[in-house]
Amino acid sequence: MSQAALRLVDKDTMDRQKALEAAVSQIERAFGKGSIMKLGGKDQVVETEVVSTGSLGLDVALGIGGVPRGRIIEVYGPESSGKTTLALHIIAEAQKKGGTCAFVDAEHALDPSYARKLGVNLDELLISQPDAGEQALEIADTLVRSGAVDVLVVDSVAALVPRAELEGEMGDNHMGLHARLMSQALRKLTGSVSKSKTIVIFINQIRMKIGVMFGNPETTTGGNALKFYASVRMEIRRVGAIKDRDEVVGNQTRVKVVKNKLAPPFKVVDFDIMYGEGISKMGELIDLGVKANVVEKSGAWFSYNSTRIGQGRENAKTFLRENPAMAAEIEGAIRQNAGLISEALAGGPGDLDGTPVEE
């Protein structure tokens, strides 16, 4: 390349750089400093801040160690599957780190005594029981914009009834009103959620679509907007009962990460939800310990470092509950083998019964 051509290229590059600097300067004058910046700049935090879900297995399945801050999360599933329990565990974990949490109880069904058993500090929990969907979402928007709330739970999307529906007659048809309300609210929320680093968790119910011949007939309420705006979508289902002789003492629960913008999705994790206790940490330590080859299983016996910890899963759980030092040691070993466990949790792009889930 000739000297003249080199000078021409350099001049063109300099002109482009000057034009870019002028554009950035104009944007900053119009919208304030920091309105545009380079992603790899010294002031930019690349690491995603997270809050634990209260389930070691689910933290691993999410790929980043918990639910991400500054994002919208959707938790959905059938009735009595553990949706509110999971949300309350996230609140409890955030409060342990000194965070402020709020609960918008549109269903008017929150049980304070159960929340306390899960580790929620009720004295520090903000709660609202709004009358209409518009009121609930306005309260949520105000709390997010304050920048002072770490976790905000809306329970549930299905209970966010538009005011026009409340004030109308029982048989009136309000086609698409709920979906429009959610779409408008999410458009307003999404920017302030990112700036305030608030985790906004929408709990949702499922409905059956009429006339579906092939594929999964299940869908979530509130239209499609939440499916697009949510960074993480988790499907939670009760897959069995835990019995003590003839008495049912808990649920076997399965969670599938249906959508994940921060790590590979479709991971499936199983854990126990015990009545009056919530997610069984000791049960997870045993199950994940076996998957990570930290805990050895020989027949019905479980052992760790040649020490027998119990015959049968329930006895092993009791042993770990009585020996917190060993439980902490096993947890540390499991976290070190998180990559191995993550591969073991990998599922396929279907729902928990193997049929494709609608995105």
From Swiss-Prot:
Which Pfam families is this protein grouped with?
RecA (PF00154), RecA_C (PF21096)
* Residues binding ATP: G77, P78, E79, S80, S81, G82, K83, T84
- InterPro entries, alphabetized: AAA+_ATPase, DNA_recomb/repair_RecA, DNA_recomb/repair_RecA_CS, P-loop_NTPase, RecA-like_C, RecA-like_N, RecA_ATP-bd, RecA_C_sf
> Which CDD domains does UniProt cross-reference here?
RecA
Q: Does the keyword DNA repair apply?
A: yes
Coiled-coil annotation reads none
Source domain of life: Bacteria
| Main subcellular localisation | cytoplasm
**Which keywords fit this entry according to its UniProt record?**
ATP-binding, Cytoplasm, DNA damage, DNA recombination, DNA repair, DNA-binding, Nucleotide-binding, SOS response
GO CC, alphabetical: cytosol
> GO: which molecular function terms?
ATP binding; ATP hydrolysis activity; ATP-dependent DNA damage sensor activity; damaged DNA binding; single-stranded DNA binding
Could you mention a single GO BP entry for this protein? DNA recombination
UniProt-listed HAMAP family? RecA
Q: What does this protein do?
A: Can catalyze the hydrolysis of ATP in the presence of single-stranded DNA, the ATP-dependent uptake of single-stranded DNA by duplex DNA, and the ATP-dependent hybridization of homologous single-stranded DNAs. It interacts with LexA causing its activation and leading to its autocatalytic cleavage.
Q: Identify this protein by name.
A: Protein RecA
